[in-house]
A protein has these predicted regions:
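Glycine-rich phosphate/adenosyl-contacting loop at the front of the ribokinase-like
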Residues: 1-67, 74-78, 85-88
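Ribokinase/PfkB-type carbohydrate-kinase core domain
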Residues: 2-20, 82-95, 108-250, 279-284, ...
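Short pre-catalytic strand/loop immediately N-terminal to key active-site residues, enriched for Gly-Thr
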Residues: 36-45, 250-262
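Short, small-residue alpha-helix embedded
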Residues: 54-56, 62, 258-286, 290
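Short alpha-helical functional segments enriched in proximate histidine and acidic residues
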Residues: 86, 274, 301, 305
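Short alpha-helix plus adjacent loop in nuclease-associated cores
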Residues: 101-108
């Protein structure tokens, strides 16, 4: 827990209400055959990268302030309730008819050969006007982002976001101009929108992505004033601090893997928490030793969580 000093984080992105389903085969499973199955709902809670990161940091003891514009459906209300349950401050979370709520169904099943697989199905909540995420507006006399900024009465230690949405990028740029450390995470890079991603990365202090999300790293040469982190799955993690070249760290091995979903989110949240414990919440504080130590600690949490079903198994097991 982060008990020495009450640090704060503000974060935003694409939120989901995750429904984790496990398929069971009551008559057994025969590879290559059409096997009868039943689906059992195991977990239903807020998820996605920003949802998990903000909830995990709330659990770690941070003042965690997610920004979210949900609808007022049952699902949207549950997402707000879940944020509170995991220790978040929902001051900047709203549930209105104009909001939006996304649902993600994650099904744990067996493929035709009997190998465990995950299947994903995303949709929006019944009654939501649009499946898209809602954000502040940035233009026009009624733009809501300037009003949000004008109403802020504090600066968080860290601002986290993971989309290319203009409002969240502009908020990050403004936060950084005020001395807040900005952490940007790339979930999936679509090359036709690469200029948007690059703009977000250039206006951040820390940039993180996985080897699955980003393959071509030629752009890293343009980020020589950043900390760039790339997770490598079972191969560990590597980082490039201020353009000094890549440093690769070994993985933390887990021989009892149940579910790897959420490991990247634990890496992010645990890394931020580890920086906080070391008093390194300003980019100028970052050294190779601090980054290495914090990333190894982050990998330990991510590896532990892989022994549980769901993205926040460690928390559930400790409550």
């Amino acid at each position: 827990m982060n008990k020495e000093k009450k640090l704060s984080i503000m974060g935003v992105g694409s939120y989901n209400l995750d429904t984790i389903v496990k398929r069971e085969y009551p008559e057994g499973f025969v590879p290559g055959k059409r096997n009868k199955f039943v689906e059992k709902v195991m977990i239903e809670e807020i998820g996605s990268n920003p949802g998990n990161v903000m909830c995990i940091l709330g659990w770690f003891g941070w003042d965690s302030y997610p920004i979210a514009l949900f609808d007022d459906s049952e699902e949207g209300m549950k997402m707000t309730s879940d944020m509170k349950r995991f220790g978040c401050n929902t001051r900047f979370v709203s549930n209105t008819p104009e909001g939006g709520t996304n649902l993600l169904k994650v099904t744990h099943a067996l493929d035709d050969y009997g190998k465990p697989v995950r299947k994903f199905s995303k949709r929006h909540a019944p009654g939501s006007g649009f499946p898209r995420d809602k954000a502040f507006t940035v233009r026009g006399k009624d733009a809501t982002l300037p009003k949000f900024i004008a109403g802020l009465d504090f600066f968080p230690d860290v601002y986290f976001y993971e989309s290319t949405t203009a409002a969240w990028r502009d908020l990050g740029k403004w936060m950084r101009s005020k001395g807040v450390m900005v952490y940007y995470e790339v979930q999936r890079m679509y090359m036709k929108e690469f200029p948007k991603y690059l703009k977000c990365m250039k206006e951040s202090d820390i940039v993180k992505f996985s080897d699955e999300a980003v393959e071509d790293l030629g752009f890293v040469d343009e980020l020589k004033d950043k900390l760039v982190i790339q997770t490598l799955g079972a191969k560990g993690v590597r980082f490039n601090l201020r353009g000094a070249g890549w440093v690769t760290l070994p993985p933390v091995v887990n021989d009892n893997v149940v579910d790897t979903e959420g490991c990247g989110d634990w890496t992010t949240a645990s890394f931020i928490n580890a920086l906080g414990k070391r008093g390194a919440v300003k980019f100028a504080d970052l050294t190779f030793e601090i980054v290495s130590d914090c990333l190894m600690e982050a990998q330990e949490y991510a590896s532990r969580n892989a022994s549980f079903l769901g993205t926040k198994g460690i928390i559930t097991a400790n409550t």
